[in-house]
Amino acid sequence: VTVLVFGAGGQIGQELLRSLSGRVVCAVTRSGRLPNGRGCVQADFGQPETLRALLDAQRPVQVVNAAAYTAVDRAESEPDVVFRINAQAPGVIAHWCAEHGVPLVHYSTDYVFDGQGTSPYGVDDPVAPLNIYGASKLAGECAVRAAGGCSLILRTSWVYAAHGHNFLRTMLRLGAASECLRVVADQIGTPTAAGLIADVTAQLLMEQVQSRHAGIWHLTAAGQTSWHGFAEEIFVQAQACGLMMRVPQVQAIGSVVYPTAARRPGYSCLDTTALVEAFGIVLPDWRQGVRGVLDEIVNRSR
C-alpha cells in the first residue's frame, strides 16, 4: 500500500480517490464500504485505540486523514463523541506515523478562529474556537503536532462537492422547491471545493513531503463571500448551465435571525500565501470551483 486514506467516503475522501487514482491507495471508511458499494477497509474513529492495529496491518508509506465529525450543530450535544473522533483518533494516527517515519496529511478548519478579525487569518494568528466542533478540531491539531514526525495540517473552509451533505447541494434542493430563500449574509469566508483540496493534497504527496514542511498550512480557494453571496452565485451558475430553469429570490438576513445550536465566526477567511509560495500552487477564485462542481452534477445527470 502506498497511500492510506481515512474517511475515503466523505467529500474530500472521495475526491482524494480521484486525485490519487494513479497511486496504490488503501481506502478506509467507517462502514467498510465506499459510496459506490465497493468494499474497503473498515475503521471506527469512535474507538481510536483500534486504529494502531489497522495501520500495523496496512503499513502505508503515506497517510491522509480526511475522516472527521463535521455536524457542527449536533456536535454541541455530544462533545465526548466529537473529541474522540476529531482529536483522540488523529493523535493515535499521528503517533503511529511519527514512530514509523510516515508523512501524514491531516485536515482542520477555519472554525478554530473566533471570527473577530477583518483580514485573512495567518497560520500563527491566535485561535479561539466558538463551538465544540472548532474546539475538537483545534485539539486534533494539537494532538497531531504533539506526536512529532512529518505531519502537514491543512486548514480549509466551507467545503462542498457534487456529492455528500453540503451547502451547495442544500441550496439546489431548496431552490428548486422555493421562490424565496433567506440566507445569512454576515458570516464571511471562502467556499472551497473538495476537489481543489484533494488535488493540492495529491500534489503535496507527489512532492515527497519532508520534515521541513511539517506544521500548519492554510488551503482554500481565492477570494471571499458570505453564505448569501455563495447562494446567489450557485443559483446564477446553476441557471446558466441548465441545471435550474428558474432561480429563487435570495433574501439576506443576519445570524441573529437564524439562530443555531453552535456559534459560528463572523469572519473566517484564511491567508494562503505561505502555501502558494512554498509549493508553487495556484489557487483559483472560489467561483471557479462552483462552476466545476455544477458541471459535474450536470454531467452525472445525463
Each language-model region and where it sits:
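Catalytic helix-loop patch of NAD(P)-dependent Rossmann-fold dehydrogenases
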Residues: R84, Q88-V92, V112-L154, W158-V159
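Mid/C-terminal beta-alpha module of Rossmann-like enzyme folds, strongest
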Residues: V200, E207-T260
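Adenosine-cofactor binding site in Rossmann-like domains, unifying the SAM/SAH pocket
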Residues: C26-T50
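NAD(P)-dependent short-chain dehydrogenase/reductase
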Residues: R145-G189, A194-Q203
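SDR active-site strand-loop-helix element
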Residues: F6, V28, V63-A67, L104-T109, ...
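NAD(P)H-binding glycine-rich loop region in Rossmannoid oxidoreductase-like domains
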Residues: Q42-I85
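N-terminal Rossmann NAD(P)H-binding glycine-rich loop of SDR-like oxidoreductase domains
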Residues: V1-G22
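Amphipathic terminal alpha-helices
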Residues: P284-R302
